[in-house]
Amino acid sequence: MRRVVGKRVQEFSDAEFEQLRSQYDDVVLDVGTGDGKHPYKVARQNPSRLVVALDADKSRMEKISAKAAAKPAKGGLPNLLYLWATAERLPPLSGVGELHVLMPWGSLLRGVLGSSPEMLRGMAAVCRPGASFLVALNLHAWRPSVPEVGEHPEPTPDSADEWLAPRYAEAGWKLADCRYLEPEEVAGLETSWTRRLHSSRDRFDVLALTGTISP
């Protein structure tokens, strides 16, 4: 594993991860974390849970990862780990009890729309049976459509149940609920994408998909 600590990238062995994981009640994984502010909030609010955040662009995690690695008096969080990795090639994690994919873009967006069953199965493989998931989709990716959405129409709660749920099920994901988030819920995600996009629009629509994973 490649751990990001500020501008440095450190090797983090499987044994080191298992030793760290053993100190906490559960593991939360945030895939495509961007600047990493969402997992920082989760880790701060849940000191008994290990939070792992990863992104393909290590530079975006530099600032927050340095803060997380500092002493607790300076904002450090010992239960937070930032990794440089892609959703296509996840590090050898295990025991994840909660999976977050918020405002995905690029190949990650294509994957959670069902275009890459391998990606969905890969994320399921690092989860324990019964793990929960939250996928939050920025619907403005369809207004107008960006190349990543391909031929997928803008999802709605009804259409997600119709065409996305079966694709998820094939990969071990059981879609239980699909709904639009209220403005305060969007703000509560604590991501730079939500703040940036919301500030440029009178209305910012996010569709949340939740359920469980049984790899």
Swiss-Prot record:
<feature type="binding site">
    <location>
        <begin position="102"/>
        <end position="107"/>
    </location>
    <ligand>
        <name>S-adenosyl-L-methionine</name>
    </ligand>
</feature>
<protein>
    <recommendedName>
        <fullName>16S rRNA (adenine(1408)-N(1))-methyltransferase</fullName>
        <ecNumber>2.1.1.180</ecNumber>
    </recommendedName>
</protein>
<dbReference type="InterPro" id="IPR029063">
    <property type="entry name" value="SAM-dependent_MTases_sf"/>
</dbReference>
<feature type="binding site">
    <location>
        <position position="55"/>
    </location>
    <ligand>
        <name>S-adenosyl-L-methionine</name>
    </ligand>
</feature>
<comment type="similarity">
    <text>Belongs to the methyltransferase superfamily. Kanamycin-apramycin resistance family.</text>
</comment>
<feature type="binding site">
    <location>
        <begin position="87"/>
        <end position="88"/>
    </location>
    <ligand>
        <name>S-adenosyl-L-methionine</name>
    </ligand>
</feature>
<feature type="binding site">
    <location>
        <position position="32"/>
    </location>
    <ligand>
        <name>S-adenosyl-L-methionine</name>
    </ligand>
</feature>
<dbReference type="Pfam" id="PF24675">
    <property type="entry name" value="NpmA"/>
</dbReference>
<keyword id="KW-0046">Antibiotic resistance</keyword>
<keyword id="KW-0808">Transferase</keyword>
<dbReference type="GO" id="GO:0008168">
    <property type="term" value="F:methyltransferase activity"/>
</dbReference>
<dbReference type="InterPro" id="IPR056262">
    <property type="entry name" value="NpmA"/>
</dbReference>
<dbReference type="GO" id="GO:0046677">
    <property type="term" value="P:response to antibiotic"/>
</dbReference>
<feature type="binding site">
    <location>
        <begin position="191"/>
        <end position="193"/>
    </location>
    <ligand>
        <name>S-adenosyl-L-methionine</name>
    </ligand>
</feature>
<dbReference type="GO" id="GO:0032259">
    <property type="term" value="P:methylation"/>
</dbReference>
<keyword id="KW-0489">Methyltransferase</keyword>
<comment type="function">
    <text>Specifically methylates the N(1) position of adenine 1408 in 16S rRNA. Confers resistance to various aminoglycosides, including kanamycin, neomycin and apramycin.</text>
</comment>
<keyword id="KW-0949">S-adenosyl-L-methionine</keyword>
